[in-house]
Amino acid sequence: MGRYAVLVSGPAGSGKSTFCSALIAHAQSLGRNVHLFNLDPAAERFEYQPSIDIKELISLEDVMEEMNLGPNGGLIYCFEYLLDNLDWLDDELGQFNDDYIIIDCPGQIELYTHFPIMSRLVNILSSQYHFRICATYLLESQFIDDKTKYFAGVLSAMSAMINLEVPHINLLSKMDLVEKGEIGSEAKRGRKREMERYLDPDPLLLMDEVNSRTNPKFHSLNQALVQLIDDFSMVSFMPLDSTDEDSVGTILSHIDNAVQYGEDEEPKEPKDMDEGDFTAQ
């Protein structure tokens, strides 16, 4: 077996930690060795105790206090410190061979979209530690009630995909709230066809709303950005309900396919048979 890692990223509040817990529970029910890697130096509560925790190396609270930095600057410092202390990472990862690592990332999307820090870490995990990596990017389903926010979320997902350069799955999270009618009332009324316009971004859906809420001088820019999304067809979403085991199982199967899980497993030796097994009845 190889080494596999799932990078769980997305904005704060998108349900990353909940998804990590659901993914771990489902994978363990399948008999897999799964471990949580907390990559958020500010995280405090976990449903599953992390097997690897960046806070054992450095914490955001300490950095902000000692270096007089704000939250974002402190977070970048923490990641730079991690990359400068790969011996710690080597010791932590060395105890997990042939295992599935779930990496719970911070919610500051600049790490995936604007800075090379996360892409450097992903490259190290892939090239130096030989992990097969699939990145997931969670966008909260409440964004479908505000097409401008949804439009920005699609662009952020695309930026993360381009920067990380690994197999990538975008997830529209908290779909249980859509089913309950708490959010996404317009999509709910339009049934499945309307929802599909959000899962596979429809340029007309984006243009109509965005242009109606922005200064006319930005309309050509909006058109260019929407055309970019449509031309490359890079961004699509899978629905995720972390409370539904079938939904989590479907996502895991797509992750498995992306990292080619189990494809390098050596075939098992056939069971030895006694001569009596071939005796005619």
Swiss-Prot record:
Site (Stabilizes the phosphate intermediate): N72
Keywords, sorted A to Z: GTP-binding, Hydrolase, Nucleotide-binding
Binding site for GTP: G13, S14, G15, K16, S17, T18, S173, K174, M175, D176
Coiled-coil spans in chain: none
GO biological process, one term: mitotic sister chromatid cohesion
Protein role: Small GTPase required for proper nuclear import of RNA polymerase II and III (RNAPII and RNAPIII). May act at an RNAP assembly step prior to nuclear import.
Motif (Gly-Pro-Asn (GPN)-loop): 70-72
Organism from which the protein derives: Mycosarcoma maydis (Corn smut fungus)
Record text on subunit structure and interactions: Heterodimers with GPN1 or GPN2. Binds to RNA polymerase II (RNAPII).
Family: Belongs to the GPN-loop GTPase family.
Protein name stated in the entry: GPN-loop GTPase 3
One Pfam family here: ATP_bind_1
Molecular-function GO terms, alphabetical: GTP binding; GTPase activity
Recorded superkingdom: Eukaryota
Region (Disordered): 259-281
